[in-house]
């Protein structure tokens, strides 16, 4: 076994690898850029080596710099994590030449699976189900149209190299096939330096389901169930779960056996993932193989008890697998939510800045681990478990140079419904301030009827949120629970407010019992009867709720029980009440006496400023160019200007027809969020 491993990555995955290496008694080396000098993975590692400026192409993916760090520290092996150099065969080759072990598959497997045309041909030869298509090189648009007609519309036009949604077009007719071929070819050449294109049948309403495989260098291979990854936006996964709510045991076994057959066909030896698309009739088709550890690997670990990072390290050290297919048991259900630094109310634009508050929910164990083919620890209890894989800390910076993922929040429970409920509570308990984040959106997904039923495809977000995420309106049942909680909390706050220093407990000024709770445009008249154990909140329709809590004024997180069911609220003080965030909703909750509530209804509502005739900057960024001038008439959808943020260019377009009256910014200007870029007549 190795004595020292270098992790050629950063963020949460570097921290994840360090945890397992530490458990195995292996010392670790971190690498870091200027931007990551104080990063969590640097603090956790036994050693750390500086490798350059913040941009990844000047630090983390420069092979020579990583190799220099390996030589300087004497690391015997390198774990690449995911992204960066994890699927770079030249990096694996450089390590081999240096006599350093790559904790991943052989170079040949990386190359074979990294090319979509080659990988599909190998899959067909290994009797793996593939999407019908043409695997030869397509010379021009006319040939693309001919092949598309032979396959039958709709078709997917794809670049052979690369990924991430680039060089991909769906065509529903000849014209779209002709245009899509040229666009995909251009994008592929610009993005990957390789303009080879192939065409395959497009599966409508597909699910994205992947199989986790684990192979060694002794010819052994197993699969560890599947992961459902259908909830995506812009080809980026947001929510994953294991197992899939859609598959039956026969389909799972067939997919698993084909995934292992493909891995063995390329001499695979490590953890890897074979991705499939699955239609509504449970027909499945090979999509691609990721020759690395997946971001979403924790859900597999939670339902199998297998530490995938440990297995990767043991396989890399030449050990045979200690686990057989018969040892693998899928126990319970696990769900992962990816917490991103982004603003869900502004089209999920990235957010940067300092984490002024970062308090994840407490982590709890999910049951036994499978070690050397034997289960270690107690059998899973009926209680839910929480896991949070992260690479940040309170006071740390979210940088513009890297992926905006803050954490991967996972829950495990005996059933899917219990895992979802555990995730709802965990999301409500997760405190993040200082930056924009997608916690409200994740909460909304967990409460969405289609997700709850398991009836979702890769089009879920596009179909259910066609206008983008606009926040959450709680149903009346939840509003009443929040109203009862707010009334009970207000009573506690009033007792504190009216207490005189030095006065004995239970001798405070009497606090009223009748209040009106106003939230989300609704009034709830209530009466509170308090005792030593909590409060009974009665509504004017005769119903009542029992509220218990140890919340005290000033606490930013309230854990309550309302009629025996948990309710977690993020709490802030506002005049006459609270700002409460729960289940994805952001509520202003006012608690008033009946007379105050009566007068409040007569007060004119303060309207927000009218910005309908302004173009506001949606994120901190740099104006790259302005495409219009004063006096120019613009049409809906017309490009107005381009802003660069987090190394990505974002085109801002006109929301409606109008005439430009004033332009307040020019190319080269740095702007803050909501700065007025231009105004219209």
From Swiss-Prot:
ATP binds at residues 116, 148-209, 235. GO terms for molecular function: ATP binding; metal ion binding; propionyl-CoA carboxylase activity. Disulfide bonds: none annotated. SUPFAM superfamilies: Glutathione synthetase ATP-binding domain-like, PreATP-grasp domain, Rudiment single hybrid motif, Single hybrid motif. Residues 1-466 form the Biotin carboxylation domain. Mn(2+) 1 binds at residues 275, 288. The modification N6-biotinyllysine is found at residue 647. Changing residue 602 to A: Loss of holoenzyme formation. Binds 2 magnesium or manganese ions per subunit. Residues 120-317 form the ATP-grasp domain. Pathway: Metabolic intermediate metabolism; propanoyl-CoA degradation; succinyl-CoA from propanoyl-CoA: step 1/3. Residues 602-681 form the Biotinyl-binding domain. Its cofactor is Mg(2+); Mn(2+); biotin. Biotin binds at residue 348. Mg(2+) 2 binds at residues 288, 290. Mg(2+) 1 binds at residues 275, 288. One of its GO terms (biological process) is lipid catabolic process. Keywords: ATP-binding, Biotin, Ligase, Lipid degradation, Lipid metabolism, Magnesium, Manganese, Metal-binding, Nucleotide-binding. It comes from the Bacteria. This is one of the 2 subunits of the biotin-dependent propionyl-CoA carboxylase (PCC), the enzyme catalyzing the carboxylation of propionyl-CoA/propanoyl-CoA to D-methylmalonyl-CoA/(S)-methylmalonyl-CoA. Within the holoenzyme, the alpha subunit catalyzes the ATP-dependent carboxylation of the biotin carried by the biotin carboxyl carrier (BCC) domain, while the beta subunit then tranfers the carboxyl group from carboxylated biotin to propionyl-CoA. The holoenzyme is a dodecamer composed of 6 PccA/alpha subunits and 6 PccB/beta subunits. This is Propionyl-CoA carboxylase alpha chain. The lineage of its organism: Bacteria, Pseudomonadati, Pseudomonadota, Alphaproteobacteria, Rhodobacterales. The gene is pccA.
């Amino acid at each position: 076994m190795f004595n020292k491993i270098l992790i050629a990555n950063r963020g949460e995955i570097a921290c994840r690898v360090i945890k397992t290496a530490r458990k195995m008694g292996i010392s670790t080396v971190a690498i870091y850029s200027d931007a990551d000098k104080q990063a969590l993975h640097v603090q956790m590692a036994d050693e750390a080596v500086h490798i350059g400026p913040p941009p990844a192409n000047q630090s983390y993916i420069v092979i020579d710099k990583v190799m220099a760090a390996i030589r300087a520290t004497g690391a015997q092996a390198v774990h690449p994590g995911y992204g960066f150099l994890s699927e770079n065969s030249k990096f694996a080759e450089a390590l081999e030449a240096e006599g350093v072990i790559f904790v991943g598959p052989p170079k040949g497997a990386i190359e074979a699976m990294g090319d979509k045309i080659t990988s599909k041909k190998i899959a067909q030869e290994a009797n793996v189900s593939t999407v019908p298509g043409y695997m030869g090189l397509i010379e021009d648009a006319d040939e693309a149209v001919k092949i598309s007609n032979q396959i039958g519309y709709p078709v997917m036009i794809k670049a052979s190299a690369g990924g991430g949604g680039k060089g991909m077009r769906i065509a529903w007719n000849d014209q779209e096939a002709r245009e899509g071929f040229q666009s995909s070819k251009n994008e592929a050449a610009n993005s990957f330096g390789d303009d080879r294109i192939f065409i395959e049948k497009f599966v409508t309403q597909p699910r994205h389901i992947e199989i986790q495989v684990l192979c060694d260098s002794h010819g052994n291979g197993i699969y560890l169930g599947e992961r459902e990854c259908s909830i995506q936006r812009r080809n980026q996964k947001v929510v994953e779960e294991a197992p899939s709510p859609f598959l039956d045991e026969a389909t799972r076994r067939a997919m698993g056996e084909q995934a292992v057959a493909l891995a063995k066909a390329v001499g695979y030896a490590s953890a890897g993932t074979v991705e499939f698309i699955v239609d509504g009739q449970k027909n499945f088709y090979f999509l691609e193989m990721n020759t690395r550890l997946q971001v979403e690997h924790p859900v597999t670990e939670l339902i199998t008890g297998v530490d995938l990072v440990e297995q990767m390290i043991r396989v890399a050290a030449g050990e045979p697998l200690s686990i057989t297919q018969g040892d693998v048991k899928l126990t319970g259900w696990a769900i992962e939510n990816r917490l991103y630094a982004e603003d869900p109310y502004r089209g999920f634009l990235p957010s940067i800045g300092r984490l002024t508050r970062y308090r994840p929910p407490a982590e709890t164990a999910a049951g036994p681990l499978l070690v050397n083919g034997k289960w270690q620890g107690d059998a899973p209890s009926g209680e839910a478990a929480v896991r949070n894989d992260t690479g940040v800390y309170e006071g740390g910076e979210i940088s513009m140079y890297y992926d905006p993922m803050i954490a991967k929040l996972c829950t495990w429970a005996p059933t899917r419904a219990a895992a979802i409920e555990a995730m709802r509570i965990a999301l409500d308990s997760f405190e993040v301030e200082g930056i924009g984040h997608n916690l409200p959106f994740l909460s909304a997904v967990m409460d969405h009827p289609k997700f709850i039923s398991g009836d979702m495809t890769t089009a879920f977000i596009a179909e259910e949120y066609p206008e983008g995420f606009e926040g959450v309106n709680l149903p009346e049942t939840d509003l009443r629970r929040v109203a009862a909680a707010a009334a009970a909390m207000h009573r506690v706050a009033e007792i504190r407010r009216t207490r005189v220093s030095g006065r004995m407990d239970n001798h405070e000024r009497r606090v009223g019992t009748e209040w009106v709770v106003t939230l989300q445009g609704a009034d709830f008249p209530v009466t509170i009867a308090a005792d030593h154990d909590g409060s009974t909140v009665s509504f004017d329709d005769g119903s009542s709720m029992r509220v218990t809590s140890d919340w005290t004024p000033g606490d930013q997180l309230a854990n309550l029980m309302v009629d025996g069911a948990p309710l977690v609220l993020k709490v802030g003080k506002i005049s006459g009440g609270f700002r409460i965030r729960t289940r994805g909703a952001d509520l202003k909750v006012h608690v008033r006496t009946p007379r105050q509530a009566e007068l409040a209804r007569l007060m004119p509502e303060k309207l927000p400023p009218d910005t309908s005739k302004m173009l506001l900057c949606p994120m901190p960024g740099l104006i790259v160019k302005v495409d219009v001038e004063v006096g120019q008439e613009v049409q809906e959808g017309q490009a107005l200007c381009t802003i660069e943020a987090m190394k990505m260019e974002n085109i801002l377009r006109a929301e409606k027809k109008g005439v430009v009256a004033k332009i307040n910014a020019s190319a080269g200007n740095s702007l803050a969020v909501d700065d007025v870029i231009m105004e219209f007549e």
